[in-house]
């Protein structure tokens, strides 16, 4: 029998010496570590972030993040606030125990130098550079006194467990779509973030000075770096109990101890009002409904057992058994109420962790910021407590990754969680060719809009005398002039715009019975209408003109309309056959074409035109002799008098329409500011024509703005619905009580919103853009050149 040789691998190893064991242990400690992070990257607790936005936290845990914008909540109608609250409850009830939700609210300072540069208007080397510099200074001053360059962003991170990345992706996508649906029902703009966006947010938290984020996915492989290397701070230090170091700055994480019997829906908003760098996080973990009910029932049973023990003790001691410790009675009632809510109402139970992260340049500033945040908590009978020796875990839990390492939790029902409403006021801050429209009075953020991007850029400016209506128009004119190449036209019934137009080297056309400036109301160009023949729209204008001339409450009769239309076709026949200036008709041609019909109705219209053809008001019976070549043109119609003013406004509107049709082919927008706009809406035919032009402006690249102080006259027009439906931009300044009531009903303004147009200061009010209603303030400093050329106050105008 052969002997089996034992392989060398299985031979009993030699016993290690004590010195060898010590050496090996040292090597293992060096390379294995003690579990504590040794680098800033190691503190960031995720394994990978993928380009589609999925974050792998560990082998079985994955998260995605939604960025959502603010909506107007605090100033909304009560029924709107209730609806938003109910939709929030629905969102939380959608989340089951397998989904962890983290709401993050970040107030982040951007690079002040770069931020200020974004509002600079570059010099052009012309006569307006001093105005550009002054206007830029005004914007930057408003920026400094407003939000101090703080950008406020909101995120919802949802975390799940899954066996692998493929399964996680499918479920996260489905959950993301469902959550977006809930945001949509609240009227909130939201989107699921991709990986680059998530990394940029992390970088912003770790670099609070606003250092720009530089990263591309194709940089990873050649560099051998991970995504953490691009977002991590230069250093993290957790050497003290209640603060930590963050790349040369100081930070502290606190938790909210909820002590109040009732919570306010303004509490979260007040935390976010602070102008310091702050990051507020709410970790919300749903408890399985069946398990929650069982737990509460067990608690009630325990409380009942304690009650029985207390009653037995009372009987033995010889006093009333109904006298129980107050805490025991209170806890028992609260537990039964909670059970009733879970069983009979649409309520669920959640565990909430509320964290506040403050970051500052110095320890003293950090202490002040934390004290300020603690004051907000105290206001609502809660307490903000610094985390002791858990600052690293607090920082990790404050990152929008969906990780909560702080187990200081408070059980709350659905409605209690939803009371932390994440909305205050919607912002209007568009990029690109946006212009400045003031400061959001609620959030102190700048309002930057591009009206040309709106569905209907047409606008209205309404306010009492002295409310800043003209200043608002002039401020917008300056913005358009300095930041675009668009044409600007002004209908100026009170000669208020002359100083501004003169300083901007614009053209003033003065129309009056004694003026030598003439504008032919019958001017037409071949692009006048979308139709093959431009006569249809021009005929509407002539009908409106004749209606104003003839007067009367009933307007033109059917036969009168017919004879006018027939005359219009006749007088334009030569011009359409040979479109040269010599063939352009004037009013006397229309007058003669009416007489040539030999009809009593035609004669009646011709007689009404006599005053404007051969009488003392024949200022409009001439060919146009002004070259409207300037990009800024003001029509001064102050001296036309009451009889001619409406005609003048109608003719100006028609002239500007002609310019709009010409500019359309060149891709240039045409802005039109019409003061005393209500005058065009009194007569039926004129109102109908103006409403039609109002609608056409939008399609042809026009941006009209009607301004008036006579709100009742404006709103009494039969065409006001068409005007309002085609106006996505409305500025409401101070209003008289009657007008305020009418506007509030027509525009569905809440009581809180109405306060901003009641005895408001000049330049303050409400701005309505599409579906957003914002309180705003847009004062122009009096010690500026701009103010002096824009003011309408007599004492200040004289100083010019």
Where are the language model's segments positioned?
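Extended, folded cores of ATP/NTP-driven motor/assembly subunits in large transport
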Residues: 2-423
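P-loop NTPase motor domains
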Residues: 71, 78-97, 104, 108, ...
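Hydrophobic anchor at the beta1->P-loop junction of P-loop NTPases
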Residues: 461
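Conserved lysine of the Walker
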Residues: 469
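Hydrophobic positions on the alpha1 helix immediately C-terminal to the Walker A/P-loop
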Residues: 472
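Post-Walker A helix-loop "phosphate-sensing" segment adjacent to the P-loop in P-loop NTPases
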Residues: 479-489
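A short helix-turn-beta junction within AAA+ P-loop NTPase domains corresponding to the substrate/partner-engaging
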Residues: 505-509, 719-732
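Conserved P-loop NTPase
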Residues: 747-800
């Amino acid at each position: 029998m052969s002997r089996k040789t034992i392989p060398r691998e299985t031979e009993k190893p030699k016993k290690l010496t004590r010195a060898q064991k010590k050496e090996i242990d040292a090597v293992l400690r060096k390379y294995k570590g003690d579990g504590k992070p040794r680098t800033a990257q190691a503190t960031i607790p995720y394994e990978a972030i993928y380009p589609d936005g999925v974050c792998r936290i560990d082998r079985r845990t994955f998260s995605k993040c939604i960025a959502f914008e603010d909506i107007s909540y605090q100033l909304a109608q009560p029924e709107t606030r209730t609806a938003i609250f109910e939709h929030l409850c629905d969102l939380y009830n959608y989340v089951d125990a397998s989904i962890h939700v983290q709401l993050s609210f970040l107030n982040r300072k951007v690079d002040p130098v770069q931020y200020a540069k974004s509002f600079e208007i570059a010099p052009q080397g012309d006569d307006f550079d001093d105005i550009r510099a002054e206007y830029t200074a005004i914007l930057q001053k408003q920026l400094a006194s407003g939000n101090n360059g703080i950008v406020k962003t909101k995120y919802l991170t949802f975390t799940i467990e899954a066996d692998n990345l493929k399964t996680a992706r499918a479920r996260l996508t489905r959950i993301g779509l469902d959550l977006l649906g809930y945001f949509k029902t609240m009227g909130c703009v939201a989107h699921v973030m991709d990986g680059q966006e998530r990394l940029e947010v992390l970088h912003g938290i770790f670099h609070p000075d606003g250092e720009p984020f530089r990263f591309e996915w194709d940089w990873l492989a050649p560099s051998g770096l991970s995504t953490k290397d691009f977002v991590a701070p230069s250093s993290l230090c957790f050497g003290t109990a209640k603060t930590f170091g963050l790349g040369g700055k100081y930070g502290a994480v606190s938790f909210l101890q909820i002590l109040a019997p009732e919570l306010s829906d303004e509490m979260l908003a007040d935390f976010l009002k602070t102008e310091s760098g702050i990051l507020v996080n709410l970790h919300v973990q749903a408890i399985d409904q069946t398990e929650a009910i069982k737990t509460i029932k067990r608690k009630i049973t325990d409380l009942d057992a304690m009650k029985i023990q207390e009653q037995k003790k009372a009987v033995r001691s010889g006093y009333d058994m109904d006298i129980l410790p107050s805490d025991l009675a209170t806890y028992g009632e609260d537990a039964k109420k909670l059970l009733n809510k879970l069983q009979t109402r649409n309520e669920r139970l959640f565990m909430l962790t509320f964290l506040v992260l403050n970051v500052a340049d110095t320890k003293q500033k950090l202490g002040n910021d934390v004290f300020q945040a603690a004051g907000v908590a105290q206001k609502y009978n809660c307490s903000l407590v610094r985390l002791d020796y858990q600052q690293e875990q607090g920082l990790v839990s404050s990152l929008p990754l969906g990780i909560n390492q702080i187990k200081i939790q408070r059980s709350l029902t659905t409605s209690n969680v939803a009371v932390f409403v994440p909305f205050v006021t919607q912002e209007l801050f568009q990029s690109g060719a946006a212009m400045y429209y003031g400061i959001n009075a609620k959030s102190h953020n700048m309002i930057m809009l591009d009206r040309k991007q709106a569905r209907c850029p047409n606008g209205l400016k309404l306010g009492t005398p002295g409310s800043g209506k003209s200043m608002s128009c002039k401020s917008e004119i300056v913005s358009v002039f300095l930041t675009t190449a668009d044409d600007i036209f002004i209908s100026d019934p009170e000669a208020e715009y002359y100083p501004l137009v003169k300083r901007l080297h614009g053209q003033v056309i003065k129309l009056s019975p004694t003026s030598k400036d003439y504008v032919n109301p019958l001017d037409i160009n071949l692009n006048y209408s979308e139709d093959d023949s431009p006569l249809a729209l021009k005929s509407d204008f002539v009908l409106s003109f004749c209606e104003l001339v003839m007067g009367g409450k009933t307007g033109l009769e059917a036969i009168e309309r017919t004879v006018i239309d027939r005359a219009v076709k006749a007088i334009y026949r030569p011009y359409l056959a040979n479109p040269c200036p010599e063939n352009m008709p004037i009013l006397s041609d229309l007058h003669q074409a009416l007489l040539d019909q030999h009809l009593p109705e035609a004669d009646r219209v011709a007689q009404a035109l006599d005053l404007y053809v051969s009488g003392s008001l024949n200022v409009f019976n001439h060919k146009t002799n002004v070259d409207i070549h300037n990009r800024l043109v003001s029509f001064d119609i102050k001296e036309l008098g009451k009889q001619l003013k409406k005609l003048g406004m109608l003719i100006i509107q028609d002239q500007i329409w002609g310019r709009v049709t010409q500019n359309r082919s060149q891709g240039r927008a045409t802005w039109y500011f019409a003061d005393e706009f209500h005058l065009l809406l009194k007569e039926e035919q004129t109102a109908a024509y103006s409403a039609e032009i109002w609608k056409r402006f939008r399609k042809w690249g026009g941006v009209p703005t009607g301004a008036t102080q006579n709100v009742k006259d404006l709103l009494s027009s039969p065409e006001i619905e068409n005007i309002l439906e085609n106006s996505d931009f409305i500025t409401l300044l101070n209003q008289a009580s009657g007008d305020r009531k009418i506007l509030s009903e027509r525009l569905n303004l809440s009581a809180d919103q109405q306060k901003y147009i009641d005895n408001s200061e000049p330049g303050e009010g409400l701005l309505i853009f599409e579906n957003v209603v914002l309180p705003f303030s847009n004062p122009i400093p009096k010690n500026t050149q701009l103010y002096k050329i824009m003011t309408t106050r007599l004492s200040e105008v004289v100083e010019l």
